[in-house]
Design a protein with these regions (language model features):
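C-terminal catalytic domain of Rieske-type non-heme iron oxygenases
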Residues: 1-141
Length: 141
């Protein structure tokens, strides 16, 4: 596939992850000409931005609806690019669903204590905060 960036140099990629409790994730990917990420970032006139939004809505203890969409600020009328990106995003989110389902099964049938790795700090922090929120909700007013 041809590169979709609108500049000739290598690029810097900025990634922003945000979680909104209990179940929203927002990911912003910014591509700018190499060397400009620290000075102008997303405000660069040639910045190419892709935003992804994930929404998980529990139905019950074992079922969750998973919605997502992605936006971009470049080539809005390019149907071929839209298809390539849509296919890629669908494949990525389908993979996420399989992983999330496997993680859920693992937690449901957990026989040993979790191994907390430093690289897992963000999801561990998320789970701990969510557990505190659930406990507070279940404890009543």
């Amino acid at each position: 596939m041809t590169s979709f960036v609108n500049f000739q140099s290598r690029c810097d990629r900025l990634q922003h992850y945000e979680v909104r409790y209990p179940s929203h994730a927002i990911i912003k990917a910014v591509f700018v000409p190499s060397g400009s990420a620290e000075t102008v970032g997303a405000s660069h006139p040639k910045a190419m931005i892709m935003d992804s939004y994930n929404f998980m809505t529990p139905i019950n203890e074992n079922q969750t609806l998973y919605f997502w969409f992605q936006l971009r600020n470049f080539s809005p009328g390019d149907a071929a690019l839209s298809k390539v990106m849509d296919d890629g995003v669908r494949a990525a989110f389908a993979e996420d669903r399989r992983v999330l389902a496997a993680v859920h099964e693992g937690f449901k049938n957990q026989a040993t204590q979790s191994l907390d790795l430093a690289t897992d700090r963000a999801p561990l922090t998320f789970r701990k905060q969510l557990a505190r929120m659930i406990a507070a909700e279940n404890s009543g007013p």
